Structure formats: structure tokens, C-alpha cells
Swiss-Prot record:
This is Large-conductance mechanosensitive channel. One of its GO terms (molecular function) is mechanosensitive monoatomic ion channel activity. The gene is mscL. It is a multi-pass membrane protein. Signal peptide: none annotated. The keyword Ion transport applies.
Length: 148
């Protein structure tokens, strides 16, 4: 079997196509989760912590270059200038994104698994008794009904 033919069979299998669709949808879904965290959750967390903005929390590790034109308090400005920064606030935001995404995927998988379970059917009727048992019952009934 040629390499091209084997690859074609592999690529056109249902699982590979499902995976491709999942990756595309996951990329789009990731954008939604990022927006939820950045625009909805982090402002509430910031409000609860007294206006703390996690996305701009960092520790500067390197010197600021003399040609730097920006705010030394801005994470993005320092990063753009090539200053080494330890951006723990950005990491916290990404971690929250991951946890939300993982939880939503968990719920989706759980829902799909529940759909895959066969419906609980009513108990099936017992199988009919074998012919020899039926014959023995007939004999028993005829003996009961016959005079002695």
C-alpha cells in the first residue's frame, strides 16, 4: 500500500475529521472564554480586591533601556521595549481562562456521555418456558383434574 493511499485512509477516517472540527471549534471557543475572563470575571475580581488589575501585575527583572519611551508601570510597554518582566498577573489570567475552559469541556463531555447511555428500558419479559416444562405442566394439570 502506498504512503499516499495510507495517509488518505487515515485522514478521511471519521475520528480525524471529528478532531479537526473540534480543534477549529475549540479555537473559536477559546476566544469566547478569553473574553469572559478578561471582560467579565477579572473586573469583578478587581472590584472585590479593591480595584486590583491582575493583567498589569508584574515584577521587572531587567534594567530599563535609556531609549525607553513609555510608562515604567506598564507591563505592555516594558515588554514591547524588551525588558525582562515576570508577568504573574498575566499568568493568573491565563490560569483562570484554562480552569474555565477545562470545566466547560468537562461539562460538555459529561453531557455527551449521558446522551450516549442507552435509555433505561423496562425489564424485558421473561423468556417462554421450554417445551418440556410446558408438557410437564399439562401432565400435572390433567392429573389434578382427573378423578381418582
Amino acid at each position: 500500500m502506498s504512503m499516499v493511499k495510507e495517509f488518505k485512509e487515515f485522514a478521511l477516517k471519521g475520528n480525524v475529521m471529528d478532531l479537526a472540527v473540534g480543534v477549529i471549534i475549540g479555537g473559536a471557543f477559546s476566544t469566547i472564554v478569553n473574553s469572559i475572563v478578561k471582560d467579565l470575571i477579572m473586573p469583578v475580581v478587581g472590584l472585590a480586591t479593591g480595584g486590583l488589575d491582575f493583567s498589569n501585575k508584574f515584577v521587572r527583572l531587567g534594567p530599563i533601556p535609556p531609549t525607553f519611551k513609555g510608562s515604567p508601570e506598564s507591563y505592555k510597554d516594558l515588554q514591547t521595549a524588551g525588558v525582562a518582566v515576570f508577568g504573574y498577573g498575566s499568568f493568573i489570567t491565563v490560569l483562570i481562562n484554562f480552569l474555565i475552559l477545562a470545566f466547560i469541556i468537562f461539562l460538555m463531555v459529561k453531557f455527551i456521555n449521558n446522551l450516549r447511555k442507552p435509555a433505561e428500558a423496562a425489564p424485558a419479559a421473561p423468556p417462554p418456558p421450554p417445551e418440556d416444562v410446558l408438557l410437564l405442566r399439562e401432565i400435572r394439570d390433567s392429573l389434578k383434574n382427573s378423578p381418582r
